[in-house]
Design a protein with these regions (language model features):
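Short alpha-helix boundary/capping motifs
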Residues: 47-48, 97-98, 134
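Glycine- and other small-residue-rich loops at beta-strand/loop junctions that grip anionic moieties
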Residues: 32-35, 94, 122
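N-terminal glycine-rich flavin-associated loop
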Residues: 81-100, 127-129
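FAD-binding core of FAD-dependent oxidoreductases
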Residues: 78-91, 112-120
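Glycine-rich, Trp-frequent "lid" loop and neighboring beta-strands that shape
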Residues: 59, 100-137
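Amphipathic, small/basic residue-rich leader segments at the start of a protein or domain
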Residues: 1-84, 104
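Conserved catalytic core of Hanks-type protein kinase domains
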Residues: 72, 95, 109
């Protein structure tokens, strides 16, 4: 098994390392915590970089590429929210939404940097308590 990163993955790391180091300064993170959110220009900067790389990638942004992005943002800022939720919600949407819905949501995300997404969970004997869910094989 080859665990070496591809040139594309190295480019993703470099791009988001530069973004994280330039944007997630201790002063900025402190202010955003006080404001209880990230400014529009920060989330839009993230989304612009994400989709620019996604458009260049032959296979698009898979879960491994998304994990590398989150790792870099955590390295710079100590956390990756809200981007972590956005990226994993994109994975869910890609797997289950029809093309019409998916395309509309992605277009809006590209334009605004804000992903309007919610995930409902309901399981027999657990309801929405995801920690109480059980599976069997």
């Amino acid at each position: 098994m080859d665990f070496a990163l591809s040139d594309n993955q190295k480019n993703i790391i470099a791009t988001f390392r530069e973004f994280g180091e330039s944007v997630f300064t201790p002063e900025s993170v402190f202010q955003w915590r006080k404001d209880q959110g990230l400014p529009d220009e920060v989330v839009k900067g993230f989304v612009d970089r994400y989709f620019a790389l996604d458009d260049q990638s032959p296979d698009g942004m898979g879960i491994m590429s998304q994990a590398l992005i989150l790792e870099e943002l955590c390295r710079c800022a100590g956390a990756a929210l809200p981007f972590q939720n956005d990226l994993f919600n994109l994975q869910i949407m890609g797997g289950f939404a029809d093309e019409t819905v998916s395309s509309r949501v992605l277009d809006d995300y590209r334009q605004t940097g804000r992903l309007m997404f919610s995930l409902g969970v309901s399981e027999p004997n657990a309801g929405s308590d995801t920690m109480s869910m059980t599976t069997s094989v």
